[in-house]
């Protein structure tokens, strides 16, 4: 089998993608959520602390994500409009409004599920 054959190419792309942290399935992602504030988001919007928006490293802007707090069981749906978090183990940065709706301040363990696009 040559290196450029379709089977090896798919394997190589999947290996590189998973190494870089991309997901090729619709499965949920779990990790730590944090609260953040700031000025402008990566898509050019002004960060609005009262909005249900969030930062994620790889999901496209406009992706709607259900964030479920694993401790309380509360869920919210946020729109991805920024990049981050840039701290190991964290999977999403939420606005203060998102954290308040989930009932936490600081950090919490969450599960993320993509629910659509805005």
What are these regions (language model features)?
Residues 2-118:
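Secreted/periplasmic proteins
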């Amino acid at each position: 089998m040559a290196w450029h054959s379709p089977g090896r190419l798919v394997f190589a792309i999947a290996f590189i993608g998973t190494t870089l942290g991309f997901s090729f399935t619709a499965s949920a992602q779990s990790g730590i959520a944090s609260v953040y504030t700031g000025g402008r988001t990566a898509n050019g919007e002004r960060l609005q602390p009262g909005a249900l928006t969030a930062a994620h490293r790889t999901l496209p802007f406009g992706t709607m994500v259900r964030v479920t707090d694993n401790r309380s069981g509360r869920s919210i749906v946020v729109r991805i409009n920024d990049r981050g978090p840039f701290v190991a183990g964290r999977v999403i940065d939420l606005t203060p409004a998102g954290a308040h709706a989930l009932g936490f301040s600081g950090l919490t363990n969450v599960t993320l599920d993509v629910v659509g696009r805005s």
